[in-house]
Amino acid sequence: FAKKLNLPENHSYTRAALLGALAVKEAIFQANLKLDGDTGFISGTSVGGMDATETYFKDFSEGKTDNNRFIRAQHPGFTTEKIAEYFEVNGFVSTISTACSSGANAIMLGARMIKTGKLKRVIVGGTDCLTKFTLNGFNSLMILSNEQCKPFDENRKGLNLGEGAAYLVLE
């Protein structure tokens, strides 16, 4: 993903930030948007940079750590900040972290910001990556399915986790 964004090999983007940046890039392209100071960015995420936590734990176990990198990358807002930084969005930038509804809440907040005249346009959506933390959390609830996803089937056996990102431009 980093190559598609022309990032250096030693970049500090988490997987969630990379997924998000690619989705934002696509949204900007599809909207034929020219970013300016009137553009806001609201991003939803459940676990944000949790993949950085897993990397940190591995590094810690091997005796090679960078606490500052870990502290910055672990909070959900870091993902939003890295994406906004990449696209040079310097206006209103906010993170919504309300579990599975984060992206939907980002869209609702963006629409309200436009409706009330606080923003002319805003990029809204969400990003999350699959991590051991997330997988183990849902596994501990014993609600994961080992079968193919079939959400509307009355014989479904649980849920299937995934990762992804989606953003759109509201004006």
What are the functions of these language-model segments?
Residues F1-S43, G49-M50:
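Conserved active-site "lid/cap" helical segment
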Residues F29-D38, G48-E171:
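Acyl-thioester C-C bond-transforming condensing/cleaving domain
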